[in-house]
Amino acid sequence: MKKRILALWVFFTLVFTFSFSTIALADSQPEIVGTSAIIMDLETKEIVYSKNIDEKKQPASITKLMTALLLAENKSKTDLLTYPAAALNEAPYSYGLNVHPVTPGDKFTAKDAMDILLLYSGNDIAYMIAENVGGTKDKFIDMMNEKAKALGMTNTNFVTPNGLDDNTDDHYTTAYDLALLLDAVYSNEWIRETMTKKESEVKSTNGPSAIVENRNKLIGVDGNIGGKTGYTEKSGRCLSALYQRNGHTLATVVLGSDYNFPVDTQVFEDTTNLANYGFNAQKEVFKAKDSEISEVTMEYNIIPLIGPKKTIKIPVTIHEDISLYPTDLEPELNSEVGKINVWTLSKDKSIGNATVSVKGYEKQYDVYSGISNMDIIKSNILYYILALLVLIIVVFLVLLIISKINRKRRNKKSRIYR
């Protein structure tokens, strides 16, 4: 009876919190207890929110997302995995300790192993997967770190397949790296399908059926389509989650939140606040339309092909706003301009491109000259007037000389005929 009352209290606490969070102002930063967090747009790879995203943290059972990814990439759902004796030594939560006793040598389908791993978070099943996929646990750890490197998780080092860190300080990752991992698992249909389940019926080949429930309390709430919880004393409460609303998909990660036992709501409140902020966040203008983002220095002949040379600085501009989500990350903006002919310059013709980048996000924009060929002509108008006057004088003098020569010739002929 007490458990039912506690469960109802937790449920209504979460519902109240999530409903209140939904109406929070879109332009206010989310309030979270977690010491490290991120929101990433999985379509564009833009970082919508960041808090200490490169700070190394213990990920606890979120580690199992990498274990799940390697299982999905190396086994089929119907493949059988053998339960090793060493798996019995893994700490709770373990299927063999907390759900139903398992005898070494018993087998699980890869499908049931995936369900137990991601829903129940079975530590012994993670060990079983490691030995069956890698041959040994150590070889599997090597596979985990190689995969992390391939995904661009440059601040990650795995030591265990389940995230237990009692005996090591070398098992770590970052919120940013876990967002990259979430992107990879979201792309895997098997894992994506598994994380959406609220519960699953599983069994070993020699054991009875058992129901394992999803420890992600947010599944199915306000667009939550999956996630992985985690907790150790070193890591604090952790949660990585996937959200989808109106076809828009976000990844959220919270590390180092509080485990407010027995209700255990804080990390879920943190995640809900992140999701609501992420779907309502507005970008801010980083560089405004028609603003100068750089300049190009070049030399040209004041009169095409001839005449003295002149050096000019050409402003490089954009014809649209460059907008980014407001975060504590520093954007980079680089421009690249092609070969320029000053006599064909137009403010409406692209002369190259600019690339704005924030961590793994990049977007290109066309760039334009801030001046046209007419501006160059106007800047040299006095020279052209002077040159024209000189030309007129020269032509006049030439014509005058020619006229004198012709007059002398006519006078000479007239004397001869007299």
Language model region names:
Residues 17-18, 78-79, 137, 203-204:
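A short hydrophobic/aromatic micro-motif that marks alpha-helical segments and, especially, helix-coil
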Residues 2-4, 59, 106, 110, ...:
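Structural motif marking the loop-to-transmembrane transition
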Residues 6, 12-15, 19-21, 44, ...:
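Generic "edge-of-domain/loop-turn" microfeature
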Residues 24-189:
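Active-site-adjacent loops and short helices of periplasmic peptidoglycan-processing enzymes
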Residues 2-26, 383-404:
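Sec-dependent N-terminal signal peptides of Gram-positive bacterial secreted proteins and lipoproteins
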Residues 153-157, 169-391, 396-416:
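Domain-terminus/edge residues, biased toward the C-terminal soluble/receptor-binding domains
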